[in-house]
Amino acid sequence: MLKRIFIYTLISFTSSISFAQNIDSITVVKTKWERTRIAKQVKLYRHHFNQKNLFAANENISFLEIKNTGRRAIFALGAEEKELITTSNFGIRDTAIAALNGNFFDVKNGGSVDFVRVNGKVINTNRLDKNGERARHQQAAVVIDNGKIMVKKWDGSTDWETKLSEQNIMLNGPLLTYNTNDELLDTTSFTRLRHPRTCLGIKPNGKILLLTVDGRNENSAGMSLHELTKLMKWLGCRTSINFDGGGSTTLWVNGMPNGGVVNYPTDNKKWDHEGQRKVSNVILVKKK
């Protein structure tokens, strides 16, 4: 009898999870996003799920969709070896259409803790974990060649990133999905708990999504990496990679209100557009 009750409970629990996921996926797919044309081949999408109707929470999501042709809109990296700069100031300095915060960095001393190469020059190298192993955010790379952006997966070798042919490289992660296959995520609080998130996704048609999910506020809970993985798949991405998030999460678009800051950065602990954290590097979208 107890065995039957256990099996019934397990089936019911599994069914409820599947039902919730199905509801969430339908919610995302059927959402009427606020859409703004930013430039040729660049569109901005925004929506505030404010009825606790995505993952049973409020979620504020913003993303750019960019044609990855290397023609009218091109990708580039902005980076500093030591100095920390806000995402918006990186964008303004480099006369960009848009900017998205990049990889993980030393908040106290400045400089990325992950390998970065810009126009052939190495800006920062990897700081390995205490056990000498690569961090999860050093096991994939965003690379740019002739203005086109791609994601590459670490091959397991020690100096993998130094042998990549692209002149512009930013290690980042963890990788969430690669060519439609979900990557195995760890069980740390960074993965399991909800935080503001920054993410890059690639759709089957080659279009790129640069996405932010706001968090640490009653207006937007943030997401776990498992939730972020699902969101990117529901938005049609076959590959997606997590960037530095938390207080760093910022999407800036030239010409938009609030100084171009589209999302709600959290470093000031207020629900406004003023809470940018200074960062080490960014992904840039520029006119060719």
Region locations from a protein language model:
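Conserved, well-ordered active-site substructure
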Residues: 110-128, 186-202, 207-237, 248-288
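Short, solvent-exposed aromatic-acidic interface loops
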Residues: 77-84, 156-160, 213-217
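Bacterial Sec-dependent N-terminal signal peptides
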Residues: 1-25
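Active-site-adjacent helix-turn-beta-strand microarchitecture at beta-sheet edges
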Residues: 105-190
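Zymogen propeptides
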Residues: 21-134, 140-141
